[in-house]
Regions:
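A beta-strand/beta-hairpin structural motif
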Residues: 100-104
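Hot-dog-fold acyl-thioester-processing enzymes
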Residues: 2-98
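HotDog/MaoC-like acyl-thioester-processing domains
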Residues: 1-17, 107-161
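Generic structural detector for well-ordered beta-strands
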Residues: 23, 27-29, 106, 156-158
Length: 161
């Protein structure tokens, strides 16, 4: 089958899923070790992230909180989007996916140390682009037992046959 037909078939496959939640990921506990490792790697050593004693006294949250970008960096795990089973199920006929970008990244609520987070993924749009398909996902990262999410983002991915 030629690439143009593969693209057309893939768009037909995606059509009924537009606007649908396609995945709810596993809960992941955010511990202080993970926060500290992220701080070390990124150089973001702000006390609100890495100093539990000071955060307990001075932070409005009463504890340390994860970096917003830590939450964002966990999207591949939280969405399971790079797992071979996820790829095979959700991208039939496609060989590879590349991250194209992010829109509307927001961090409505902090992730306190010890909190559990998970991601919900919804397909917003799918359209043909040169030699492939671009999908815009809405990803919402929930915090267990919290009303407001930790993060919401439009994630753009491009897939190619």
């Amino acid at each position: 089958m030629d690439k143009q037909n593969q693209i057309g078939d893939f768009l037909k496959f995606l059509g009924p899923q537009i606007g649908q939640e396609i995945h709810v990921g596993p809960w992941l506990e955010i511990d202080q070790q993970r926060i500290n490792q992220f701080a070390e790697v990124t150089g973001d050593q702000q006390w609100i992230h890495i100093d539990p004693e000071r955060a307990a006294k001075e932070s409005p949250y009463g504890t340390t909180v994860a970096h917003g970008y830590l939450t964002l960096s966990l999207l591949p795990y939280l969405t399971q989007s790079n797992h071979p089973d996820f790829f095979q199920k959700n991208y039939p006929g496609m060989k590879y996916r590349v991250n194209y970008g992010l829109n509307r990244v927001r961090f409505p609520s902090p992730v306190k140390v010890g909190s559990k987070i998970r991601a919900r993924t919804t397909i917003q749009t799918a359209e043909e682009v040169k030699n492939g398909v671009q999908i815009c996902y809405i990803i919402t990262v929930d915090i267990e037992s919290e009303e407001k999410p930790a993060c919401s983002v439009e994630f753009l991915a491009r897939l190619y046959p």
